[in-house]
C-alpha cells in the first residue's frame, strides 16, 4: 500500500506537481487495548479495572510510544517520501478537535442518537465490534429440529435452529408467506418450549423456504436478522444473556448463570425429556470470532450510539454517480454503491477505554444529556455539578473517516486545506472500501461539501505463495524490515509493484525478491561500467544526427517509446505494467544490447567523436532510465544518479523524462530490430546445434534489398560482437548460396550458418537420434495415458490439463528434432 502510494508521489513530484503526502496512523482502538491488557495480565497479573482508567491510559500511551513507531520504521525503511513534519495520529490534538466538532455537529442535526440495536459483542473484550473486527470461520455444528406445539390443536410446527440455547428469548415463529406448507399456521399461536410463552406465527419474505423446515424461531435480542424482523412486526425483545456471555434470569432460573455451552447442553437434554426434540442434523456454518481475542462473538441487543447513515449516504452515492470520484478499477463502483444503497445505521460506540471518549455528559440531577465541543464541568440545563461523561469511546473508524480534512487542521480554514484539499488519489485495499472509503466520502461531503479525493485506486491483498492470506496463526507473514535487510528495500518494492494489477490479490514469492535484487545489481554494474568510461567525458559535447550509429538511433528511439509507455502506465494506475516496461528496457535493450555494442567504440575506436557520441548516448539513456526507475527503486537509482553527470541536487526532484521528437528515428529503429532478429537467429542455430561457446562460426547473410545490404556492410561488426561470429559474408540474392549450412530467415535477411567444421556430425547425429527415441517414448506414454477414460474421467481437471500440456511440448520437441536431423543430413 505504502509502496504504491510512494510510486505515485515520486512520479508526480518529478512531473512538476506540488505534492504532499501526510504520514500517520490511527490509534487502533481495540487492537491496542487488547495488547496492553495482555501485557498487564502477564507482567502484573492485573486487569485494567484493577488499576483504573487514568492509569491504564498512561500505560497505553507508553506502549504506543514504545511499539507504535514500528509501522513508521517500516514505511521509512521502504523509502516512502512522506512529509514527516506533518505526521498525524488520530488521537493527537488536531485530529481530536475535528472528531469532537463532527460528533457534536451530527448530534445537533439529529444524525447521532442513542438506542438499542443488535451489534457484534465480544464477551471477553466486553465491547461492541465492527464487522471488520470479526473473523468468520467455518465450523462443524448441528441443526436441531424442535417442535413448537400449536395452542388449541393437536399439532405442532417444526422449526430448525443452530442455537437452541436462545429458545428462551423467542418472541415469534416466522414462515415465508409463499410457502404453501406453512400457510395454515400463519396467525396461529404456538408455545415456546421450556418457557411456555405464547407467540404468534408470522409471515415474512425474509424466511428461506429451503432452510430446514421452512419455519424459523425469532429471537430479536440475539440475532441481527431476527432484530430487523422484530422491528417490522413490533415484536418484544427479550435479552437472555449477560454481557460476559453467561445466561441471565430471563432465560429461566434453571439456566441462570450457565455458560452458553452449558446452557446448550442443558436445553437439548430438557427438550429430549419433553419429547420436543425431533432430530438433529450435522451442519457446517460460519461462526464469528473476535479478531483480537478469538472469543466467539455474540449478536446482542445493547444500548449504543449510532449515526443515521441514509441521509449521509445520499450525497456520497451521488458524488460517485456524477463522476466527482471514480474507482480504479471501475468494477469496485458497484461494490461501493451496493453497500451505500443498503446501508444500516452505524454503531460508533465501543466499550473500551483507549480512544476518543464520547463527548456526551449526563446530569445526575435533571437527567439531561448534553453533547459538547469542550469538556463540561456543569450541566448546561440546570447548572448542577453532578455530571459524568459517557465512559464509552468512538469506533476507530470514526476518526479515520475524517482523515482527509482533519489532518490539515479543520475546522480551521488553514492554508493546507486551501492548497491541498481535496486530495488527488486515495490508494487502499478492496477490503476496507466500506469501512474507510465510504465513510471518508460521506463525512467529507457532509462537512467540506466536496469529495475527499478524485480517484480511489484499489489494490488487492498480498498473499503467500500458496494464495493464503498472511496471518500469525499460519506463520506465513513477512517482515518488510527483514526482507529489506536481506535483499534491499528496492528489491522488495519492485516485487510488490510488478506483482500488482489494480484490484487483484498478488502472491508473494521470495524468489521474485531475489530476482529483483539481481535486477538492482544489473543496474549497478551497468552504471559502474558507464561511469568508468567517462574519464574524458565532455558535458558540453552534443552530437549531430549524423554522428549517431544505427544502435544509437535505435536505443534513443526505444527510450522515447519507454518514456511514453511508463508515463501512460503511471497516469492510468497500471503501475505493474509500467514497472515491467522499464525493467525490460533497462535489462534487455540497454544492458544486454546497447552497452555491448557501445563497447566497440569505447574500447577500440580511435575516433574521438565516435567515443564522445557513445558517451553522450550512454549518459542520456542511463540517467533517463534511472529517472524512470526512481519511483520504483529510489535508493539505488538516487545513489547511481549522483555519480553520473547530472543537473540539479537530487534525482527525487529531477524532471521526469519526456519524449524528445528530435531523437526519434523510427525507420532506423525498425532496421536495428531486424538486425537483432538476425543475431538471435544465429544464437538459436548455434544452441540447437550444440556449438561450444568458445567456437566462432562464419555466417553468410543474404539481404533482400540494397538498403539492407548497405546496413549489413556498415554494421557487420554487430554480428561479430553479439553472435560469436568470426567472418561475415554478405551476398546478393543472385549469388550462389552456401552449401553444408543451416539456414533461417528473418525479415529482409536470409541467414546461413556454416557448422561443418564446428561440430562432430556423426556424434551429433547419434545424440539427436537418441533424443528422438526418448521423445517418441514420452509421446506414446502420454497418448496412452490420455486415451484412458479411467484417467481423464477421474483425475482433477488441472492434472489432465497438465498432461496435455506435456504432450504438446513433446510433440513440438519432436518436430524440432526432426528438423535438426534433416539439417545434419545436409552438412
Question: How should these model regions be labeled?
Answer:
Residues 24, 157-175, 292, 298, ...:
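Conserved phosphate/anionic-ligand binding catalytic regions in large, soluble enzymes, centered on
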Residues 37-156, 167, 211-365, 436, ...:
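Residue patterns forming the tRNA-binding/recognition surfaces of aminoacyl-tRNA synthetases
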Residues 145, 338-398, 402, 446-489, ...:
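Feature 926 captures the class I aminoacyl-tRNA synthetase adenylation module centered on the KMSKS loop
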Residues 1-36, 99, 160-161, 166, ...:
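N-terminal catalytic cores of NTP/NDP-binding nucleotidyl/phosphoryl-transfer enzymes
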Residues 148-154, 177, 191-196, 363-365, ...:
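Short acidic, glycine-rich loop/turn motifs
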Residues 37-41, 60-74, 179-206, 234-235, ...:
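Conserved oxyanion/phosphate-binding beta-strand-loop segments in alpha/beta enzyme cores
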Residues 2-3, 157-193, 216-223, 233-239, ...:
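Extended active-site and interfacial segments that coordinate phosphate-rich ligands
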Amino acid at each position: 500500500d505504502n509502496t504504491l502510494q510512494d510510486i505515485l508521489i515520486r512520479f508526480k513530484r518529478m512531473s512538476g506537481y506540488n505534492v504532499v503526502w501526510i504520514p500517520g496512523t490511527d490509534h487502533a482502538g481495540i487492537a491496542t487495548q487488547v495488547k496492553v491488557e495482555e501485557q498487564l495480565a502477564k507482567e502484573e497479573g492485573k486487569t485494567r479495572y484493577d488499576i483504573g482508567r487514568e492509569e491504564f491510559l498512561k500505560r497505553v500511551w507508553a506502549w504506543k510510544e514504545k511499539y507504535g513507531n514500528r509501522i513508521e520504521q517500516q514505511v521509512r525503511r521502504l523509502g516512502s517520501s512522506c512529509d514527516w513534519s506533518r505526521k498525524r495520529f488520530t488521537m493527537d490534538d488536531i485530529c481530536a478537535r475535528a472528531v469532537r466538532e463532527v460528533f457534536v455537529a451530527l448530534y445537533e442535526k439529529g444524525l447521532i442518537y442513542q438506542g438499542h440495536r443488535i451489534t457484534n459483542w465480544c464477551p471477553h473484550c466486553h465491547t461492541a465490534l465492527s464487522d471488520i473486527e470479526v473473523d468468520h470461520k467455518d465450523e462443524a455444528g448441528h441443526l436441531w429440529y424442535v417442535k413448537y406445539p400449536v395452542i388449541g390443536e393437536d399439532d405442532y410446527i417444526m422449526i430448525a435452529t443452530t442455537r437452541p440455547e436462545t429458545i428462551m428469548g423467542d418472541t415469534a415463529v416466522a414462515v415465508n408467506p409463499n410457502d404453501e406448507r406453512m400457510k395454515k399456521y400463519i396467525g396461529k399461536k404456538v408455545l415456546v418450549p421450556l418457557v411456555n410463552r405464547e407467540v404468534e406465527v408470522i409471515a415474512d419474505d425474509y424466511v428461506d423456504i429451503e432452510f430446514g423446515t421452512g419455519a424459523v424461531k425469532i429471537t430479536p435480542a440475539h440475532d441481527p436478522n431476527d432484530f430487523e424482523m422484530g422491528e417490522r412486526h413490533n415484536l418484544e425483545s427479550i435479552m437472555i444473556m449477560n454481557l460476559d456471555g453467561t445466561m441471565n434470569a430471563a432465560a429461566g432460573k434453571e439456566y441462570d448463570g450457565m455458560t452458553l455451552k452449558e446452557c446448550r447442553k442443558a436445553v437439548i437434554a430438557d427438550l429430549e425429556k419433553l419429547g420436543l426434540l425431533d432430530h438433529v442434523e450435522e451442519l457446517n456454518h460460519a461462526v464469528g470470532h473476535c479478531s483480537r481475542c478469538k472469543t466467539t462473538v455474540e449478536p446482542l441487543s445493547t444500548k449504543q450510539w449510532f449515526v443515521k447513515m441514509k441521509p449521509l449516504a445520499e450525497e456520497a452515492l451521488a458524488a460517485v454517480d456524477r463522476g466527482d470520484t471514480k474507482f480504479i478499477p471501475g468494477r469496485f463502483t458497484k461494490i461501493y454503491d451496493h453497500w451505500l444503497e443498503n446501508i444500516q445505521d452505524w454503531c460508533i460506540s465501543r466499550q473500551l477505554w483507549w480512544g476518543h471518549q464520547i463527548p456526551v455528559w449526563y446530569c445526575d440531577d435533571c437527567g439531561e444529556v448534553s453533547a459538547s465541543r469542550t469538556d463540561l464541568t456543569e450541566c448546561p440545563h440546570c447548572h448542577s455539578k453532578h455530571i459524568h461523561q459517557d465512559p464509552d469511546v468512538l469506533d476507530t473508524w470514526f476518526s479515520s473517516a475524517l482523515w482527509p480534512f482533519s489532518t490539515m487542521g479543520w475546522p480551521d480554514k488553514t492554508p493546507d486545506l486551501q492548497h491541498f484539499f481535496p486530495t488527488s488519489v486515495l490508494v487502499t485495499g478492496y477490503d476496507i472500501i466500506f469501512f474507510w472509503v465510504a465513510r471518508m466520502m460521506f463525512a467529507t461531503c457532509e462537512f467540506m461539501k466536496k469529495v475527499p479525493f478524485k480517484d480511489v485506486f484499489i489494490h488487492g491483498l498480498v498473499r503467500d505463495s500458496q494464495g493464503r492470506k498472511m496471518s500469525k496463526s499460519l506463520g506465513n507473514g513477512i517482515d518488510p524490515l527483514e526482507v529489506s535487510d536481506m535483499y534491499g528495500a528496492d528489491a522488495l518494492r519492485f516485487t510488490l509493484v510488478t506483482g500488482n494489477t489494480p484490484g487483484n490479490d498478488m502472491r508473494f514469492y521470495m524468489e521474485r525478491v531475489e530476482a529483483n535484487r539481481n535486477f538492482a545489481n544489473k543496474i549497478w554494474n551497468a552504471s559502474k561500467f558507464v561511469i568508468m568510461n567517462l574519464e574524458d567525458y565532455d558535458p558540453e559535447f552534443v552530437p549531430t544526427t549524423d554522428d549517431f550509429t544505427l544502435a544509437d538511433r535505435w536505443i534513443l528511439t526505444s527510450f522515447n517509446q519507454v518514456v511514453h509507455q511508463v508515463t501512460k502506465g503511471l497516469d492510468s494506475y497500471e503501475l505493474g505494467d509500467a514497472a515491467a516496461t522499464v525493467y525490460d528496457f533497462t535489462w534487455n535493450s540497454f544492458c544486454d544490447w546497447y552497452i555491448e555494442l557501445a563497447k566497440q567504440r569505447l574500447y577500440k575506436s580511435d575516433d574521438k567523436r565516435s567515443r564522445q557520441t557513445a558517451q553522450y548516448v550512454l549518459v542520456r539513456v542511463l540517467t533517463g532510465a534511472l529517472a524512470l526507475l526512481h519511483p520504483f527503486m529510489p535508493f539505488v537509482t538516487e545513489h547511481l544518479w549522483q555519480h553520473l553527470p547530472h543537473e540539479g541536487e537530487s534525482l527525487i526532484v529531477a524532471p521526469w523524462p519526456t519524449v524528445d521528437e528530435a531523437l526519434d528515428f523510427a525507420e532506423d529503429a525498425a532496421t536495428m530490430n531486424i538486425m537483432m532478429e538476425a543475431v538471435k537467429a544465429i544464437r538459436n542455430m548455434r544452441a540447437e546445434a550444440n556449438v561450444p561457446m568458445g567456437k566462432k562460426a562464419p555466417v553468410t547473410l543474404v539481404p533482400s534489398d540494397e538498403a539492407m545490404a548497405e546496413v549489413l556492410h556498415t554494421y557487420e561488426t554487430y554480428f561479430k560482437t553479439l553472435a560469436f561470429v568470426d567472418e561475415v559474408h554478405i551476398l546478393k540474392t543472385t549469388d550462389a548460396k552456401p552449401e553444408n549450412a543451416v539456414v533461417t530467415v528473418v525479415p529482409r535477411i536470409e541467414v546461413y550458418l556454416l557448422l561443418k567444421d564446428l561440430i562432430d556430425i556423426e556424434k551429433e547425429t547419434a545424440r539427436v537420434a537418441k533424443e528422438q527415441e526418448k521423445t517418441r517414448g514420452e509421446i506414446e506414454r502420454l497418448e496412452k495415458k490420455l486415451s484412458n477414460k479411467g484417467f481423464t474421467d477421474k483425475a482433477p481437471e488441472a492434472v489432465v490439463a497438465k498432461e496435455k500440456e506435456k504432450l504438446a511440448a513433446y510433440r513440438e520437441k519432436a518436430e524440432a528434432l526432426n528438423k535438426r536431423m534433416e539439417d545434419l543430413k545436409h552438412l
